[in-house]
Amino acid sequence: MKVLILGAGRVGGSLARALVSNGYDVAIIDQDKNALNSLEEKLDILTIEGHASHPVSIKKSSADESTTVIAVTSNDEVNIIACQIAKKSFNVKKTICRITDSAYGNDLTVFGDNAIDILISPENEVKNHLKDLICLLYTSDAADDTCC
């Protein structure tokens, strides 16, 4: 499966390593040439220096209907726009978008009809996981979810 990662920071780099080790065909776009060079030295991936939400950058990755796009830059708006462009202009298979600002909520329809398939908020994921852990610690019966 082809995966296009938008953002070569900690999350994007870690994701690229994990996907390559599982046999995925990975391309990654970022404006940071040093981050791209570092990944390219260690991994068999296509690196593209460019803006994640620019159609020209996405086109260089050969994104198509068999590609899953995962937008994990540090900018919510870039991630959202990049997913919209990838879906509408390149007809990619799936889009996964990381957001950090809770103002965007979880209603995917606000981003356009089917433009974003999966919305991920690391902050919400951590909050929910910690809440579940605390619940388990203070509940004598793990099946009892009254505290959650």
Describe these PLM feature segments.
Residues 138-148:
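Single conserved hydrophobic/aromatic residue that forms the stacking wall/gate
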Residues 30:
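Conserved acidic E/D residue at the C-terminus of a beta-strand in Rossmann-like folds
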Residues 12-13:
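N-terminal Rossmann-fold NAD(P) dinucleotide-binding loop
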Residues 19:
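Aromatic pocket-lining residues of Rossmann-like dinucleotide-binding sites
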Residues 36-136:
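Phosphate-bearing ligand-interacting subdomains
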Residues 8-9:
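Glycine-rich Rossmann-fold phosphate-binding loop(s) that bind the pyrophosphate
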Residues 2-5:
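Beta1/beta-strand and adjacent pyrophosphate-binding region of the FAD-binding site
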Residues 27:
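Conserved beta-strand positions in the Rossmann-like core of class I SAM-dependent methyltransferases
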